[in-house]
Amino acid sequence: MTGKRLGVGVVGAGRWSNWAHMPGWVRDPRCELVAVCDTELGKAKEAAARFGAKVATADYTELLRRDDIDVIDVVTRDSQHFEINWAAVEAGKHVLSEKPVAHDHRDVRRIAELAKSRGLKTKVGFTFRYSPAVRYLKAMIDSGALGTPFIYNAYEQNSQWLNPQSPLRSGERAGDGPLKVASLEGYGAPVIDIGHWYMDSDLTAVVGVMRNFIPERMILDTGTMARVNIDDGDIFLGEFASGAICSVQSSFVTVGNYPGIEVRVYGSEGAAIARLVEESGICETLKMAKPDDVEFREVEIPARYYPAGGSPRESWRTLYYANLTANFASEVLGEIDGNEGNFDDGLRVQEVINAVEISHHERRWVSLPLDGAGGAAR
């Protein structure tokens, strides 16, 4: 595809799409935002006008039929992701999907295999993989600066839904019954992905717990309070095939600023901490320590890890997503080899999420990969 602009159609014109996805596409001169779709046509028209798209529609299949659209970007409610992703791949489009690609890892495997069989590039909205600090730390690990990685600790937690009056996007998970995954899938997924990437190894076993700390919440669809039996806080331990170990925690009811991520890697020759939190006017810091200097000292992130015009004082939303969309454009246009953060990576993450859910409900370690029975007991 070298030599042409990349046509993009965005499905979903909500806040995250306006804050991160569409600004990322229009920031890249190699890309053209052709169309915006939303079930609320007014939102689609407003976003199209704001970002210069020539088409606004309430029917996503219209985007799939257009020859001037190469990439479909899915930024809808979680429950709609898989249907739209599948239709887009079947239509021969490259796909960027917000997480999760699907709630069940088996569905993620199906669509990952379909996309590969058709020679299509895919990407999951693992926003924080594209943070300059996170990417520079990956380069440091790969260079051997930390030696052999032993331990990975990570969390994503902030106050997004600490207030019960802050409405959730839908009432899909309202009611009683078994505790349903929420924070683990929304907040845990990005740091699980970074863990796989940093440790260069798959998780082989997990054990975890989930909690529902705020049982009643305002439901966006109804405007009323209701029982919402979801995990709003969780933690798990994991073992990697390499012999390394990890702890991962997520919550959207913990006091703290956005995005609220910290990842730590401890190796045989050093340790590093990437902290992605908007504090003191900047959105991230990177610190490193060595065996002969155990105080963690801030590391300057080279300019090449930032998008054009980017800096640590930019909003993390646009900063990280500009890197993500630029990376995907480069992959689709054939300017770089590979396809990182794709649906295969999404599969590995979703399988861990499903395994931790099993672990919580069955109170046991769960081995990976999952089998048809939902994981072997240990």
Which stretches of residues belong to each language-model region?
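Hydrophobic residues in well-ordered beta-strands that form the structural core
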Residues: 17, 57, 96-97, 103, ...
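Beta-loop-alpha module in the N-terminal Rossmann-like domain of NAD(P)-dependent dehydrogenases
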Residues: 51-114
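Rossmann-fold dehydrogenase core element
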Residues: 110-128, 147-151
